[in-house]
């Protein structure tokens, strides 16, 4: 399958955040998946998939997400899977524990916790600017993602926490 994706780093946005959005898009790819599209509420997801009624069924937030925001998301969109993506497994585990302590584990049953390998994020940050050709392989049940960027190969770990 071939698809074109256009990403632009916004003022004040880190390149790491842009790369994490790209990796999240690649990990969760499905038809209709979109990056930075509003869904009509106060918050805007980094990556989202909608159902036929225009409601989020997949909401991905990368980087910093307040625990209060997470609570509002799972309450407002109970049918959606909410994916929290961070660069470091340790940071993800601490955030998850904070969310459980604040919101309760039962409120977070629709949340998936993912850490993408920092090495892959750094590798992409050093190489991405302008247009590129990117080939991606994400095996089912991925614990890694394999990339070829303009002919150069890269690989990164994917860790899912608390499943």
Task: Give residue spans per PLM region.
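Cysteine-centric segments in proteins
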Residues: 26-27, 87, 114
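Conserved catalytic cores of phosphodiester-cleaving nucleases, focusing on short active-site segments
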Residues: 47-49, 56-69, 73, 82
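Non-catalytic C-terminal interaction segments of nucleic acid-processing enzymes
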Residues: 108-163
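A short acidic, amphipathic alpha-helical/loop segment
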Residues: 69-76, 95-98
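Terminal alpha-helical anchor/extension segments at protein ends
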Residues: 41-43, 50
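Short, charged/polar "capping" segments at the starts of alpha-helices
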Residues: 89-95
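Acidic-basic catalytic patches of nuclease active cores, encompassing PD-(D/E)XK
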Residues: 1-39
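Hydrophobic beta-strand segments of well-ordered beta-sheets in folded domains
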Residues: 78-85, 108-112
């Amino acid at each position: 399958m071939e698809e074109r994706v256009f990403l632009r780093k916004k003022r004040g946005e880190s390149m790491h955040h842009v790369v994490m959005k790209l990796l999240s898009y690649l990990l969760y790819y499905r038809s209709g998946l979109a990056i930075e599209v509003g869904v009509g509420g106060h918050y805007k997801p980094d990556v989202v998939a909608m159902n036929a009624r225009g409601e989020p069924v997949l909401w991905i937030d990368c980087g910093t997400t307040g625990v209060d925001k997470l609570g509002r998301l799972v309450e407002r969109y109970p049918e959606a899977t909410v994916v929290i993506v961070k660069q470091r497994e340790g940071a993800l585990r601490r955030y998850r524990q904070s969310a459980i302590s604040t919101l309760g584990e039962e409120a977070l049953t629709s949340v998936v916790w993912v850490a993408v390998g920092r090495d892959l994020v750094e590798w992409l940050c050093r190489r991405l600017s302008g247009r590129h050709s990117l080939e991606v392989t994400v095996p089912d049940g991925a614990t890694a993602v394999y990339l070829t960027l303009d002919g150069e190969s890269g690989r990164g770990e994917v860790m899912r926490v608390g499943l």
